[in-house]
Amino acid sequence: MEVNIVNIANEVVGSIDLNPQVFGLEPRRDVLKEVVNWQLAKRRAGTHKAKGISDISGTTAKPYRQKHTGRARQGSLRSPQFRGGAVIFGPVPRSHEYSLNKKVRRLGLKVALSMKVAANKLVVLDSLDVDLKKTADAKGVFGNFAGHSSYLVVSESCKEEVVRACRNLRGVDLLKCVGINVLDILKHDCVILTVDTVKSLEGRLSNE
């Protein structure tokens, strides 16, 4: 599976053979759903909290005697049937994280990359070692890759000045290769990988 290598001006400077074990898989939406749900669950803060009957301030005295009032018996004014009362079985702070098999996570990553290749929305860049000192310069660079609504740039390493130049651009995100994930790939219209990133991903994922 051969694709062109382009430079920062979107000019073809060579070609590279992509490993079909990583970039040539059939779409598996079931796997993508599993991985995305797993990522979203890990992102949840889990800080939701409702006050139980032991958390609410107020008297603990019995509001009135048990019998001979003609009213329903009550033991506390903090019970859930009263205004300002407790919430029964309400949410408590907890982690929503759960485990997902590594094989499924890696398969999801390969399927997401393969879908971008099949849709012709994956660009292989020769290098990101360029001089970009201003946001205007970075905007001009991404103008060379027009036709996409958003861009995810993945590189083994990136200059700090390039990160600063790109971080204020809407629809452009930079990631290190170690942080590439299914959710970010699917959220962005175009994925730009450097040659080093492609080789690194193939080394990590081709033996699965």
From Swiss-Prot:
GO molecular function: rRNA binding; structural constituent of ribosome
Keyword vocabulary terms for this entry: Ribonucleoprotein, Ribosomal protein, RNA-binding, rRNA-binding
Disordered: annotated segments: 49-78
A GO cellular component entry from the record: ribonucleoprotein complex
Keyword Lipid metabolism carried by entry: no
Signal peptide extent: none
UniProt GO BP: translation
InterPro entries linked: Ribosomal_uL4, Ribosomal_uL4-like, Ribosomal_uL4_dom_sf
Entry's transmembrane regions: none
Gene3D superfamilies linked: 3.40.1370.10
Family assignment from sequence similarity: Belongs to the universal ribosomal protein uL4 family.
Subunit structure: Part of the 50S ribosomal subunit.
Function: One of the primary rRNA binding proteins, this protein initially binds near the 5'-end of the 23S rRNA. It is important during the early stages of 50S assembly. It makes multiple contacts with different domains of the 23S rRNA in the assembled 50S subunit and ribosome.
Protein name (record): Large ribosomal subunit protein uL4
Natural source organism: Anaplasma phagocytophilum (strain HZ)
